[in-house]
């Protein structure tokens, strides 16, 4: 065989192979590659969209948490203010009740002192009358007089 014919035959076979690959095999491969590229592009776009949505959700969570903390602090502050009001009201009520009880006790003490004075006056007057009776029943001499006065003083 001649080398030219071999080269020519191989060239024809190679050209036929190129034509078969270009017409029968290449278009489906290109189609599959393009579909795969499109799926990858869609996946990347979806991932980007997911990242954006995640960032937005995180921002919303931060805002919600901030609002919740502010509301919680506000509620706590209101509770402290209410507790302070209740304490102040209880203090005022306790002071009022203490003053009322002190006034009642003072009135009771004054009444008891007055009763004691009256009782003491009655007792002293009875003792004075008894002492005078004893003095009048006995002879009045200095020693007897002194003894009776000492007894009277001891009873008082």
UniProtKB/Swiss-Prot annotation:
Belongs to the ATPase B chain family. PANTHER family: ATP SYNTHASE SUBUNIT B, ATP SYNTHASE SUBUNIT B', CHLOROPLASTIC. One of its GO terms (cellular component) is plasma membrane. F(1)F(0) ATP synthase produces ATP from ADP in the presence of a proton or sodium gradient. F-type ATPases consist of two structural domains, F(1) containing the extramembraneous catalytic core and F(0) containing the membrane proton channel, linked together by a central stalk and a peripheral stalk. During catalysis, ATP synthesis in the catalytic domain of F(1) is coupled via a rotary mechanism of the central stalk subunits to proton translocation. CDD domains: ATP-synt_Fo_b. Keywords: ATP synthesis, Cell inner membrane, Cell membrane, CF(0), Hydrogen ion transport, Ion transport, Membrane, Transmembrane, Transmembrane helix, Transport. The keyword Membrane applies. The keyword Ion transport applies. One of its GO terms (molecular function) is proton-transporting ATP synthase activity, rotational mechanism. This is ATP synthase subunit b. F-type ATPases have 2 components, F(1) - the catalytic core - and F(0) - the membrane proton channel. F(1) has five subunits: alpha(3), beta(3), gamma(1), delta(1), epsilon(1). F(0) has three main subunits: a(1), b(2) and c(10-14). The alpha and beta chains form an alternating ring which encloses part of the gamma chain. F(1) is attached to F(0) by a central stalk formed by the gamma and epsilon chains, while a peripheral stalk is formed by the delta and b chains. HAMAP family: ATP_synth_b_bprime (MF_01398). It is a single-pass membrane protein. It comes from Xylella fastidiosa (strain 9a5c). It is found in: Cell inner membrane. The chain crosses the membrane at residues 3-23.
């Amino acid at each position: 065989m001649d080398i030219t014919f071999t080269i020519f035959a191989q060239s024809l076979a190679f050209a036929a192979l190129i034509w078969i690959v270009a017409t029968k095999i290449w278009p489906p491969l290109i189609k599959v590659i393009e579909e795969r590229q499109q799926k990858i592009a869609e996946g990347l776009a979806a991932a980007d969209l997911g990242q954006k949505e995640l960032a937005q959700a995180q921002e919303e969570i931060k805002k919600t948490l901030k609002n919740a903390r502010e509301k919680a602090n506000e509620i706590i502050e209101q509770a402290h203010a209410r507790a302070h009001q209740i304490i102040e009201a209880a203090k005022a009520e306790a002071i009022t009740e203490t003053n009322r009880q002190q006034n009642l006790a003072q009135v009771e003490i004054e009444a008891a002192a007055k009763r004691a004075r009256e009782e003491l006056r009655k007792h002293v007057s009875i003792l004075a009358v008894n002492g005078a009776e004893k003095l009048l029943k006995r002879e009045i001499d200095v020693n007897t007089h002194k003894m009776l006065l000492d007894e009277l003083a001891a009873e008082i």
